Protein backbone atom coordinates (compact mmCIF):
# COMPACT_ATOMS: atom_id res chain seq x y z
CA UNK A 1 0.00 0.00 0.00
CA UNK A 2 1.26 3.48 -0.88
CA UNK A 3 1.17 6.23 1.71
CA UNK A 4 1.93 9.90 1.19
CA UNK A 5 4.34 10.85 3.96
CA UNK A 6 4.31 14.35 5.51
CA UNK A 7 8.07 14.32 4.92
CA UNK A 8 10.10 11.58 3.26
CA UNK A 9 13.11 10.45 5.34
CA UNK A 10 16.46 10.44 3.52
CA UNK A 11 19.28 10.48 6.10
CA UNK A 12 18.02 9.51 9.57
CA UNK A 13 20.93 9.08 11.98
CA UNK A 14 20.16 11.49 14.85
CA UNK A 15 18.55 14.93 15.37
CA UNK A 16 21.58 16.84 14.07
CA UNK A 17 22.23 14.40 11.21
CA UNK A 18 18.88 13.87 9.54
CA UNK A 19 17.41 15.38 6.38
CA UNK A 20 14.02 15.03 4.72
CA UNK A 21 12.17 15.75 1.50
CA UNK A 22 9.00 17.74 2.14
CA UNK A 23 7.58 17.43 -1.39
CA UNK A 24 5.86 14.64 -3.31
CA UNK A 25 8.70 14.61 -5.85
CA UNK A 26 12.30 14.56 -4.65
CA UNK A 27 13.23 17.36 -7.07
CA UNK A 28 10.32 19.70 -6.27
CA UNK A 29 11.87 21.34 -3.19
CA UNK A 30 15.13 21.81 -1.34
CA UNK A 31 16.06 19.14 1.19
CA UNK A 32 15.28 20.13 4.80
CA UNK A 33 16.36 19.35 8.33
CA UNK A 34 13.73 18.26 10.88
CA UNK A 35 13.17 21.91 11.86
CA UNK A 36 12.69 23.00 8.21
CA UNK A 37 16.10 24.60 7.64
CA UNK A 38 17.40 24.16 4.10
CA UNK A 39 20.29 21.69 3.88
CA UNK A 40 21.34 21.58 0.26
CA UNK A 41 21.58 18.01 -1.02
CA UNK A 42 21.39 17.84 -4.81
CA UNK A 43 21.41 14.95 -7.26
CA UNK A 44 22.24 15.36 -10.96
CA UNK A 45 22.36 12.73 -13.70
CA UNK A 46 23.96 13.33 -17.09
CA UNK A 47 22.43 10.82 -19.50
CA UNK A 48 24.36 10.59 -22.76
CA UNK A 49 25.63 14.11 -22.10
CA UNK A 50 22.30 15.71 -21.21
CA UNK A 51 21.80 16.90 -17.64
CA UNK A 52 18.81 16.20 -15.39
CA UNK A 53 18.03 16.83 -11.73
CA UNK A 54 16.63 14.03 -9.56
CA UNK A 55 17.13 15.47 -6.04
CA UNK A 56 16.70 18.99 -4.66
CA UNK A 57 15.21 21.90 -6.57
CA UNK A 58 18.66 23.04 -7.85
CA UNK A 59 17.16 26.16 -9.42
CA UNK A 60 20.57 27.68 -10.18
CA UNK A 61 21.50 24.71 -12.40
CA UNK A 62 18.57 25.37 -14.75
CA UNK A 63 18.20 21.69 -15.69
CA UNK A 64 15.01 19.70 -16.29
CA UNK A 65 14.05 17.05 -13.75
CA UNK A 66 13.86 13.36 -14.40
CA UNK A 67 10.33 12.00 -14.04
CA UNK A 68 9.74 10.43 -10.64
CA UNK A 69 7.62 7.31 -11.11
CA UNK A 70 7.62 5.80 -7.63
CA UNK A 71 8.65 6.23 -3.99
CA UNK A 72 8.43 3.66 -1.20
CA UNK A 73 9.27 3.92 2.49
CA UNK A 74 10.12 1.12 4.90
CA UNK A 75 11.65 1.00 8.39
CA UNK A 76 15.19 1.84 7.22
CA UNK A 77 15.00 2.84 3.53
CA UNK A 78 13.35 5.30 1.19
CA UNK A 79 13.55 4.26 -2.47
CA UNK A 80 12.84 6.56 -5.41
CA UNK A 81 12.57 5.60 -9.08
CA UNK A 82 13.12 8.12 -11.88
CA UNK A 83 13.00 7.90 -15.67
CA UNK A 84 14.43 10.04 -18.48
CA UNK A 85 16.00 9.57 -21.91
CA UNK A 86 15.67 5.79 -21.93
CA UNK A 87 17.10 5.31 -18.42
CA UNK A 88 15.57 4.22 -15.13
CA UNK A 89 17.48 5.58 -12.12
CA UNK A 90 16.88 4.02 -8.70
CA UNK A 91 17.97 6.02 -5.64
CA UNK A 92 17.84 4.06 -2.38
CA UNK A 93 18.45 6.01 0.85
CA UNK A 94 19.32 3.59 3.66
CA UNK A 95 20.24 4.24 7.30
CA UNK A 96 20.92 0.97 9.19
CA UNK A 97 19.95 2.12 12.70
CA UNK A 98 18.83 -1.36 13.74
CA UNK A 99 17.32 -1.02 17.25
CA UNK A 100 18.24 -4.57 18.35
CA UNK A 101 21.97 -3.99 17.71
CA UNK A 102 23.53 -1.07 19.59
CA UNK A 103 26.61 -0.95 17.35
CA UNK A 104 24.47 -0.59 14.23
CA UNK A 105 22.04 1.79 15.93
CA UNK A 106 24.87 4.13 16.90
CA UNK A 107 26.73 4.15 13.56
CA UNK A 108 26.89 7.74 12.18
CA UNK A 109 26.71 6.65 8.54
CA UNK A 110 23.94 6.59 5.95
CA UNK A 111 23.81 5.39 2.34
CA UNK A 112 22.58 6.49 -1.05
CA UNK A 113 22.79 3.64 -3.56
CA UNK A 114 22.31 4.65 -7.20
CA UNK A 115 21.45 2.11 -9.91
CA UNK A 116 21.05 2.94 -13.62
CA UNK A 117 19.15 0.60 -15.97
CA UNK A 118 18.19 0.95 -19.62
CA UNK A 119 14.52 1.16 -20.57
CA UNK A 120 15.41 0.24 -24.15
CA UNK A 121 18.07 -1.91 -25.78
CA UNK A 122 20.60 0.93 -25.87
CA UNK A 123 23.68 1.28 -23.70
CA UNK A 124 23.55 4.70 -22.05
CA UNK A 125 26.23 6.63 -20.18
CA UNK A 126 24.95 8.00 -16.87
CA UNK A 127 27.25 10.30 -14.91
CA UNK A 128 25.75 10.81 -11.45
CA UNK A 129 26.81 13.70 -9.20
CA UNK A 130 25.66 14.12 -5.60
CA UNK A 131 26.30 17.51 -3.96
CA UNK A 132 26.22 17.99 -0.16
CA UNK A 133 26.59 21.50 1.24
CA UNK A 134 28.26 22.97 4.31
CA UNK A 135 24.79 23.24 5.86
CA UNK A 136 25.40 19.72 7.18
CA UNK A 137 28.11 20.95 9.56
CA UNK A 138 27.77 24.72 10.11
CA UNK A 139 24.90 27.15 10.47
CA UNK A 140 26.92 30.00 9.02
CA UNK A 141 26.82 30.47 5.24
CA UNK A 142 30.16 32.17 4.58
CA UNK A 143 32.56 30.14 2.46
CA UNK A 144 35.55 31.03 4.60
CA UNK A 145 34.01 29.44 7.69
CA UNK A 146 34.67 25.84 6.53
CA UNK A 147 37.66 23.75 5.56
CA UNK A 148 37.76 20.55 3.50
CA UNK A 149 40.25 17.70 3.62
CA UNK A 150 40.85 14.66 1.42
CA UNK A 151 41.07 11.29 3.19
CA UNK A 152 43.13 8.19 2.44
CA UNK A 153 40.87 5.15 2.78
CA UNK A 154 41.24 1.51 1.77
CA UNK A 155 39.72 -0.44 -1.14
CA UNK A 156 39.65 2.48 -3.55
CA UNK A 157 37.15 4.51 -1.53
CA UNK A 158 37.23 8.20 -2.42
CA UNK A 159 36.34 10.45 0.53
CA UNK A 160 36.58 13.97 1.92
CA UNK A 161 35.50 15.68 5.10
CA UNK A 162 34.29 19.20 5.79
CA UNK A 163 33.96 21.19 9.00
CA UNK A 164 33.94 24.63 10.49
CA UNK A 165 37.15 26.56 11.02
CA UNK A 166 35.96 27.28 14.54
CA UNK A 167 34.94 24.22 16.56
CA UNK A 168 32.78 25.34 19.48
CA UNK A 169 31.89 21.79 20.49
CA UNK A 170 28.51 21.65 22.25
CA UNK A 171 28.53 25.43 22.01
CA UNK A 172 24.84 25.81 21.24
CA UNK A 173 21.62 24.02 22.11
CA UNK A 174 17.86 24.26 21.85
CA UNK A 175 15.25 23.85 19.14
CA UNK A 176 15.62 25.35 15.68
CA UNK A 177 19.40 25.16 15.86
CA UNK A 178 21.69 23.24 13.55
CA UNK A 179 24.96 21.67 14.58
CA UNK A 180 27.90 24.08 14.42
CA UNK A 181 30.72 21.71 15.27
CA UNK A 182 32.14 18.39 14.11
CA UNK A 183 32.87 17.10 10.62
CA UNK A 184 30.70 15.93 7.73
CA UNK A 185 32.09 13.15 5.52
CA UNK A 186 31.21 12.16 1.95
CA UNK A 187 32.54 8.94 0.42
CA UNK A 188 31.99 6.94 -2.77
CA UNK A 189 33.07 3.47 -3.89
CA UNK A 190 32.67 4.02 -7.64
CA UNK A 191 33.83 7.51 -8.52
CA UNK A 192 35.62 10.47 -7.00
CA UNK A 193 34.80 12.95 -4.24
CA UNK A 194 35.80 16.60 -4.69
CA UNK A 195 35.09 19.97 -3.12
CA UNK A 196 33.29 22.70 -5.01
CA UNK A 197 32.08 26.26 -4.41
CA UNK A 198 28.63 27.24 -5.64
CA UNK A 199 26.88 30.51 -4.85
CA UNK A 200 27.65 31.32 -1.20
CA UNK A 201 28.42 27.76 -0.05
CA UNK A 202 31.08 25.08 -0.09
CA UNK A 203 29.98 21.63 -1.24
CA UNK A 204 31.44 18.16 -1.28
CA UNK A 205 30.46 16.29 -4.42
CA UNK A 206 30.72 12.67 -5.52
CA UNK A 207 30.99 12.01 -9.25
CA UNK A 208 30.26 8.49 -10.51
CA UNK A 209 30.68 7.67 -14.24
CA UNK A 210 28.10 4.90 -14.73
CA UNK A 211 26.47 3.17 -17.67
CA UNK A 212 23.46 0.92 -18.08
CA UNK A 213 25.54 -2.18 -18.83
CA UNK A 214 28.24 -3.60 -16.59
CA UNK A 215 28.99 -0.48 -14.48
CA UNK A 216 25.55 0.62 -13.36
CA UNK A 217 25.83 1.01 -9.58
CA UNK A 218 27.49 3.45 -7.18
CA UNK A 219 27.15 3.75 -3.42
CA UNK A 220 27.60 7.06 -1.61
CA UNK A 221 28.09 7.17 2.16
CA UNK A 222 27.28 10.23 4.27
CA UNK A 223 28.88 10.21 7.73
CA UNK A 224 29.36 12.56 10.66
CA UNK A 225 31.79 12.92 13.56
CA UNK A 226 30.20 15.17 16.17
CA UNK A 227 33.25 14.84 18.51
CA UNK A 228 31.01 15.08 21.60
CA UNK A 229 27.29 14.41 21.25
CA UNK A 230 25.56 15.81 24.34
CA UNK A 231 26.28 17.57 27.61
CA UNK A 232 24.58 15.55 30.35
CA UNK A 233 24.36 17.41 33.67
CA UNK A 234 27.55 19.25 32.72
CA UNK A 235 29.39 16.14 31.50
CA UNK A 236 30.29 16.02 27.76
CA UNK A 237 29.45 12.55 26.43
CA UNK A 238 30.65 10.80 23.29
CA UNK A 239 28.55 8.65 20.99
CA UNK A 240 28.35 4.94 21.79
CA UNK A 241 30.22 3.97 18.61
CA UNK A 242 33.31 5.84 19.89
CA UNK A 243 33.62 3.88 23.13
CA UNK A 244 36.55 1.74 21.91
CA UNK A 245 38.36 4.48 19.98
CA UNK A 246 36.90 3.75 16.55
CA UNK A 247 37.35 6.55 14.00
CA UNK A 248 34.90 7.89 11.44
CA UNK A 249 37.28 6.74 8.71
CA UNK A 250 36.95 3.18 10.00
CA UNK A 251 33.17 3.56 10.19
CA UNK A 252 33.14 4.54 6.50
CA UNK A 253 35.34 1.62 5.44
CA UNK A 254 33.08 -0.76 7.36
CA UNK A 255 30.01 0.88 5.85
CA UNK A 256 31.10 -0.30 2.41
CA UNK A 257 32.45 -3.71 3.40
CA UNK A 258 29.43 -4.59 5.56
CA UNK A 259 26.69 -3.08 3.39
CA UNK A 260 25.15 -6.41 2.33
CA UNK A 261 25.08 -7.67 5.92
CA UNK A 262 23.52 -4.46 7.24
CA UNK A 263 20.95 -4.43 4.44
CA UNK A 264 19.84 -8.03 4.89
CA UNK A 265 19.49 -7.68 8.67
CA UNK A 266 17.47 -4.48 8.37
CA UNK A 267 15.27 -5.97 5.65
CA UNK A 268 14.56 -8.99 7.87
CA UNK A 269 13.62 -6.72 10.78
CA UNK A 270 11.36 -4.65 8.53
CA UNK A 271 9.56 -7.71 7.11
CA UNK A 272 8.90 -9.11 10.59
CA UNK A 273 7.77 -5.74 11.93
CA UNK A 274 5.47 -5.16 8.97
CA UNK A 275 3.88 -8.61 9.31
CA UNK A 276 3.29 -8.21 13.04
CA UNK A 277 1.85 -4.73 12.56
CA UNK A 278 -0.41 -5.81 9.69
CA UNK A 279 -1.72 -8.74 11.73
CA UNK A 280 -2.47 -6.39 14.61
CA UNK A 281 -3.93 -3.39 12.79
CA UNK A 282 -3.93 -3.87 9.03
CA UNK A 283 -1.75 -2.64 6.17
CA UNK A 284 -2.34 1.06 6.83
CA UNK A 285 -1.17 0.63 10.41
CA UNK A 286 1.89 -1.31 9.26
CA UNK A 287 2.92 1.44 6.83
CA UNK A 288 2.35 4.13 9.44
CA UNK A 289 4.53 2.18 11.88
CA UNK A 290 7.31 1.92 9.31
CA UNK A 291 7.37 5.68 8.90
CA UNK A 292 7.22 6.13 12.68
CA UNK A 293 10.35 3.99 13.08
CA UNK A 294 12.24 6.37 10.78
CA UNK A 295 11.07 9.42 12.70
CA UNK A 296 11.79 7.90 16.12
CA UNK A 297 15.28 6.68 15.28
CA UNK A 298 16.19 10.10 13.83
CA UNK A 299 15.10 11.78 17.07
CA UNK A 300 17.43 9.89 19.42
CA UNK A 301 21.12 9.64 20.28
CA UNK A 302 22.97 6.72 21.89
CA UNK A 303 25.83 7.88 24.13
CA UNK A 304 27.98 6.40 26.88
CA UNK A 305 29.12 7.96 30.15
CA UNK A 306 32.70 7.82 31.39
CA UNK A 307 31.69 5.07 33.83
CA UNK A 308 30.37 2.93 30.96
CA UNK A 309 26.68 3.61 31.55
CA UNK A 310 24.70 3.72 28.30
CA UNK A 311 22.14 6.47 27.73
CA UNK A 312 19.58 6.65 24.92
CA UNK A 313 18.51 10.27 24.77
CA UNK A 314 15.70 11.85 22.78
Description of each model-found segment:
Residues 83-104:
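Low-complexity, acidic Ser/Thr/Pro/Gly-rich terminal tails and inter-domain linkers that flank the onset
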Amino acid sequence: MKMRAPAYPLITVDPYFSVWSTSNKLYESDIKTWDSRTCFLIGKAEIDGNGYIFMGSAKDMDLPPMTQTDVTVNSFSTTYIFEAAGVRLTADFFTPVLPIDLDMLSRPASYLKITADALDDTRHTVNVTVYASQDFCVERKLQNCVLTERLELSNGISAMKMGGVEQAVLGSSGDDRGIDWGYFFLACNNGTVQNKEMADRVFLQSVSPLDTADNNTATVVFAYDDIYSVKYFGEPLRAYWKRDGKTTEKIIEEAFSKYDNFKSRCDEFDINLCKSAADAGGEKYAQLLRLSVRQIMAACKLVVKNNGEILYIT
